[in-house]
Every structure is written in structure tokens, then in C-alpha cells.
Amino acid sequence: SVIASLDAAAEASSDAERLAAAKSATVAITRLEREASRDPMARDHISSQALFESLSAAIERRSTFVQVKTKSPVDLQVPFEVAVAIAEATFQALNNSLVHAPGATSRKVTLSSGRKSLKVVIVDNGPGFRMSSVPRNRLGVRLAIFKRLETLGVSAHLNSSPGEGATWVFEWSSP
């Protein structure tokens, strides 16, 4: 259930447990939104506002060290599969920040939508890294995030360099 997933996220003792619980909560919330709607289109889509509310609640339950800001939300209809992939990618990026930049003093997530696009930006002020230094056999950054999003038409970018923190950008445009 949604409440059980959120409680599990709040009480988890490791980053992996928090990530799994937060993902579960987001999926449960978006499914609930989808099932509750009587609009046939909503069975395959979720509003950007519902997605942002779900993400914000799950992130805030998961960590008090992450600021979440929503900018000018326009209620855009987003394919359900795209919304879930963006939510999972957001949690993976936050998990990477928590695990690999534990000394970061700032983590921010900005959620924005326009008439035809949706954007999620995750920024930390950790030590940063070079993408080329991530071993090719690591699935997290390259496969789990970039490949999955790209197959759904979501652009994914990571800007980072040593001493500069990391900025993840996930952007989807409506056809």
C-alpha cells in the first residue's frame, strides 16, 4: 500500500532500502491515481501535477536533506510508463548522490512542466566525478537511467566534474 511504502521509506536503515521503498511508494501512488480516474485516457496517463505531488511526497519522506521545488506546473498528461521511468531515474540519481557524495551539503530537485514538456533537475554540491571514470560494467548510471529513459523518448543528461557536484536533467516532450 501507499502508506506502508512511505513508512518503509522513512524507517529504512540503508540507502538501498530507502530507494526501494521510495520507488514502491511512487509506483503505488501513481497506480492509485490512475485507477481512481474515470477518464479512459488517464488509465494510460498521469497528470504532471499528480506525478510531481507523488515525487515530492516520496522524496520528502525519504530524506530531509533534499529540497524539492515545483516551478509553474502546467497540468500536462504524461504517459504512465514515462512517469514511472522518470520517478525511478530521479530516485536512482538521488541514491547515487547519497551514496557517492555523502558530504554534499545541498541536494535540490526541481520539477517543472510546460504546455508540452516536463523536466526534472537534480543538483548536488558533492565532490563530482568524471563520467569516463565510471567503469563500463556499472549498470546504474549508463543502463538503468539513460538507456531506459531514452527508449521512452526522455532525454537524460548528467553534468559533473571533480569539485563541481553533479546535475542530472531528465526531460520529456509531448508529441
Predicted segments, located by residue:
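ATP phosphate-binding glycine-rich loop and adjacent ATP-lid/helix-beta elements
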Residues: 133-162
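Acidic ATP/Mg2+-coordinating residue in the GHKL
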Residues: 124
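Glycine-rich nucleotide-binding loop
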Residues: 117, 128, 161-169
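A conserved short beta-strand within the histidine kinase catalytic ATPase domain
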Residues: 105-112
